[in-house]
């Protein structure tokens, strides 16, 4: 009887674990601003990723980056712009946070952009796959322009 109870308990707990796996978070429209960003990161690098006005943007932070008030700061914002832009005016826009694999993908009919962080090195990877020749421009936008 004790073995049957233990077996049923393990089956129940295992079933709850399998059913309890989080699903990927999917957005079908672009964000209005950074308050609608998706978190992503690995190691000591953290990001907030979103798509605004057809540009892919992300804030970058690193553990240990504190200001004079002991607040954790973002290092700045990166803006990724593709030309011609495959996310402009498309009804097939999709931004997905892949929870089990730890990356964010932005896709449309013509392209897929993947952002992920190497957990062993402080490196952010931005991969772009498109059906047509596309140029990518990445800008760093810092709001810390003077010492405090």
Q: Regions from the language model: what does each represent?
A:
Residues 21-148:
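Beta-sandwich/jelly-roll carbohydrate-recognition scaffolds of carbohydrate-active enzymes
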Residues 4-15:
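Sec-dependent N-terminal signal peptides
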């Amino acid at each position: 009887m004790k073995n049957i109870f233990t077996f049923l308990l393990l089956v129940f707990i295992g079933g709850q674990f399998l059913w309890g796996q989080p699903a990927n978070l999917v957005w079908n429209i672009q964000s209005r601003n950074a308050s609608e960003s998706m978190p992503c990161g690995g190691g000591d690098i953290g990001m907030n990723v979103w798509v605004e006005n057809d540009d892919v943007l992300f804030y970058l932070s690193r553990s240990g980056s504190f200001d004079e008030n002991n607040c954790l700061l973002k290092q700045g914002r990166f803006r990724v712009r593709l030309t011609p832009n495959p996310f402009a005016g498309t009804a097939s826009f999709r931004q997905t946070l892949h929870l089990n694999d730890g990356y964010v993908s932005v896709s449309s009919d013509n392209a897929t952009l993947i952002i992920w962080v190497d957990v062993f090195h402080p490196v952010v990877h931005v991969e772009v796959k498109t059906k047509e020749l596309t140029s990518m421009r990445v800008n760093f936008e810092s709001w810390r322009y003077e010492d405090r």
